[in-house]
Amino acid sequence: MQNHLYTALKKYAQSNPIRFHMPAHNGIDLEIDTSMDITELSFSDNLIESDGVIKNCENNIANAYSTKYGLMITSGATTAIAIALHTAKNKGKKLLMLGDLHKSVHNYANVLAFDISYSENLDNINPNDYDAIIFTSPNYFGKVQDIQKLKNTTALVIADSSHGAHFAFNSKLPDLQTDIANITVLSFHKTLPVLTGGAGILTNDEKLYQMLVYSRSILHTSSPSYLIMASIDNAICEMALNGETLYNQVISEIDNFKKHLCDRYFVEDNDDKTRLCISAKEKDGYKIAKLLESKNIYLETIYFDILVAIVTPYNYKHLPALANALNLIDIQDNIKRFEIKKATKIDTNNKKIEFLQIKNAVNRVCAATVGIYPPGIPMLTVGDLITKQTIQFLTDKKHTVFGLIDGKIPVFTD
């Protein structure tokens, strides 16, 4: 029997790759080893009912982000989203889902049986009509959403700030807007030197904090990883002490990168100065990424002609190598972006689910959240009518598709 995954990971690690992908420790030595991998002992506290060293770590998180309360999560921002929505359900059922949201939001909003409304923006929206509002800021491409209109709303405001965990540590980066959001979800491992799965939740409200802790006790694994928690602890302390200097270096090197990039590309302007989104000007970004990988350079993701790199204090020194490699690549293959159109919603009450080959699912009603990953934003959600155009896109081998079961798509029976 061959250990397939271990072999693949070992081969990758031994190749000394240039990594512009999460987790944001980028393969450095975190000084955490398996001898520290323990369970709840007399001295090590308990995440679900923290009152010792874990509680102290969570207090550090709150202090670092200038909030009253912080919670640690070891099973990723997906669990943090579930906890936030479970907490919101205590207020009421009416949920506004604002703009593009991660698949986990769609999934848990359905599991928790919210009465869901959708809007691309806050135009013509009265926030007080809802019990809760959830939005993404920053998004996968470093754009921050303006939520000033939500400042005095009676709705519970949830910010999925998974990609903004580093914002608090440098004055040139955007504000997390924790003064407006009642609950803020962070994915530490995306932008900080934290093991995969490290996430957190912030709030300034005592009653919400109590409800979040209660929800965590229900939804979080009772076997949290102490190694992940230790990496969060170290990262928060390191960034609180040195984040301003470290990210100044990152931002400066990105500015130099832009100057050395040839005119076949341009870097898109972002609110997050560390999220590098390189436009290949309608050339096939997937082919460019394959050529970069042949040079042992790995990006976070490709989105048509956009190449996304997560730049951190631990990989910014490799930006000249990325610029040089891109400048040597000159492909002629064009690519058109697929515009995701909002699908027609169909009533799915009391219908059963079956699984079809995706090519046979035209004009059927989707029973899952389906899209490409990254960025993890669904193209289809529960109740959407499946079109031929969407199927053509999802069957393009350039993408990693989520939501399919052994290549089949869940649909409701006619």
Regions found by a protein language model. Name each.
Residues 95, 379, 383-386:
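Generic structural signal for buried aliphatic residues
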Residues 400-414:
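Charge-dense polyanion-binding interfaces
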Residues 2-10, 64, 72, 76-266, ...:
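Conserved PLP-enzyme active-site core in the AAT-like
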Residues 34, 38-76, 100:
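Conserved N-terminal alpha-helix of the aminotransferase class I/II PLP-enzyme fold
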Residues 1-52, 182:
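N-terminal "arm"/small-domain region of PLP-dependent enzymes with the aminotransferase-like
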Residues 61, 109, 383:
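Short hydrophobic alpha-helical segments of the AMP-binding
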Residues 262-382, 393-404:
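Conserved C-terminal alpha-helix-loop-beta "cap" of PLP-dependent enzymes
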